[in-house]
From Swiss-Prot:
GO molecular function: TIR domain binding; Toll-like receptor binding
Subunit structure: Homodimer. Also forms heterodimers with TIRAP. Binds to TLR2, TLR4, IRAK1, IRAK2 and IRAK4 via their respective TIR domains. Interacts with IL18R1. Interacts with BMX, IL1RL1, IKBKE and IRF7. Interacts with LRRFIP1 and LRRFIP2; this interaction positively regulates Toll-like receptor (TLR) signaling in response to agonist. Interacts with FLII. LRRFIP1 and LRRFIP2 compete with FLII for MYD88-binding. Interacts with IRF1. Upon IL1B treatment, forms a complex with PELI1, IRAK1, IRAK4 and TRAF6; this complex recruits MAP3K7/TAK1, TAB1 and TAB2 to mediate NF-kappa-B activation.
Gene3D superfamilies, A to Z: Death Domain, Fas, Toll/interleukin-1 receptor homology (TIR) domain
Main location as per UniProt: cytoplasm
One Pfam match: TIR_2
Described function: Adapter protein involved in the Toll-like receptor and IL-1 receptor signaling pathway in the innate immune response. Acts via IRAK1, IRAK2, IRF7 and TRAF6, leading to NF-kappa-B activation, cytokine secretion and the inflammatory response. Increases IL-8 transcription. Involved in IL-18-mediated signaling pathway. Activates IRF1 resulting in its rapid migration into the nucleus to mediate an efficient induction of IFN-beta, NOS2/INOS, and IL12A genes.
InterPro entries: DEATH-like_dom_sf, Death_dom, MyD88_Death, Myelin_different_resp_MyD88, TIR_dom, Toll_tir_struct_dom_sf
Record protein name field: Myeloid differentiation primary response protein MyD88
Protein source organism: Pan paniscus (Pygmy chimpanzee)
GO biological process, any: positive regulation of canonical NF-kappaB signal transduction
Domain Death: 32-109
PTM remark: Ubiquitinated; undergoes 'Lys-63'-linked polyubiquitination. OTUD4 specifically hydrolyzes 'Lys-63'-linked polyubiquitinated MYD88. Deubiquitinated by USP3 that cleaves 'Lys-63'-linked ubiquitin chains leading to inhibition of MYD88-induced NF-kappa-B signaling.
Domain remark from Swiss-Prot or TrEMBL: The intermediate domain (ID) is required for the phosphorylation and activation of IRAK.
């Protein structure tokens, strides 16, 4: 039941949700998208055509083909890339001539986006009152003026880092090895390790957001089975991926340092991984990681 063109059913969601991240779409909408796009036909563009429009490469698309729900995997992978948004997704579906999808799911997408906007407004209203900022490099609230051990309490000289380390408490021994290899050698990098560098007594979510977005040039994610169960690590990772396209120069670097029983997180699968478990490349591991963190 294809529409005759970019009709009214798709115009409203595109105009009102153009800048919202893909995280605004809930599982019900994603499952229905999969029902439309997973089916391979000769008369309508499927998920592979959408993947090409999203600039996925041939080998990436072939890997997605191995999954039971390739459309769902595609959306998970794409939402961490620059330019990914609800509006952009709808524009690509329009370009591919899938007006049937837009007309069928448009109201549900609009509903999800309105819920997302309302939730963001509620969270914003619950934040502490902001003080006037003279410069973008100064913390935006009084609460965040002194959050690390070397911070200026007045916020005039906020402490900065080469990388924020996202990790679980159970992985602290590897983080300590990372400190020895990257800070206490000729690399002289400066890592932000919450248990060592962050002062107690403030909101962990506000601190993480401030450090990842404003204070750290990169973010290293120590992936393990315990990481997959951590709400704090999940928030930090998704926050870093959801930053505006201009902030994606703060490259996310996933590290796998030991064997995992669970599946590697799909949201990180299309980012190059530093694999400490590979004996063939282990001797190059710290050099590669240090150079990645030293990039401008």
């Amino acid at each position: 039941m294809a529409a005759g063109g970019p009709g009214a059913g798709s115009a409203a969601p595109i105009s009102s949700t153009s800048s919202l991240p893909l995280a605004a779409l809930n599982m019900r909408v994603r499952r229905r998208l999969s029902l439309f796009l997973n089916v391979r036909t000769q008369v309508a563009a499927d998920w592979t055509a959408l993947a090409e429009e999203m600039d996925f490469e041939y080998l990436e698309i072939r890997q997605l083909e191995t999954h039971a729900d390739p459309t769902g995997r595609l959306l998970d992978a794409w939402q961490g890339r620059p330019g990914a948004s609800v509006g952009r997704l709808l524009e690509l579906l329009t370009k591919l001539g899938r007006d049937d999808v837009l007309l069928e799911l448009g109201p549900s997408i609009e509903e999800d986006c309105q819920k997302y906007i309302l939730k963001q407004q509620q969270e914003e209203a619950e934040k502490p009152l902001q003080v006037a900022a003279v410069d973008s490099s100064v913390p935006r609230t009084a609460e965040l003026a002194g959050i690390t051990t070397l911070d200026d309490p007045l916020g005039h000289m906020p402490e900065r880092f080469d990388a924020f380390i996202c990790y679980c408490p159970s992985d602290i021994q590897f983080v300590q090895e990372m400190i020895r290899q990257l800070e206490q050698t000729n690399y002289r990098l400066k890592l932000c390790v919450s248990d060592r560098d962050v002062l107690p007594g403030t909101c962990v979510w506000s601190i993480a957001s401030e450090l990842i977005e404003k204070r750290c040039r990169r973010m290293v994610v120590v992936v393990s089975d315990d990481y997959l169960q951590s709400k704090e690590c999940d928030f930090q990772t998704k926050f870093a991926l959801s930053l505006s396209p201009g902030a994606h120069q703060k490259r996310l670097i996933p590290i796998k340092y030991k064997a995992m029983k669970k599946e590697f997180p799909s949201i990180l699968r299309f980012i190059t991984v530093c694999d400490y478990t590979n004996p063939c490349t282990k001797s190059w591991f710290w050099t590669r990681l240090a150079k990645a963190l030293s990039l401008p």
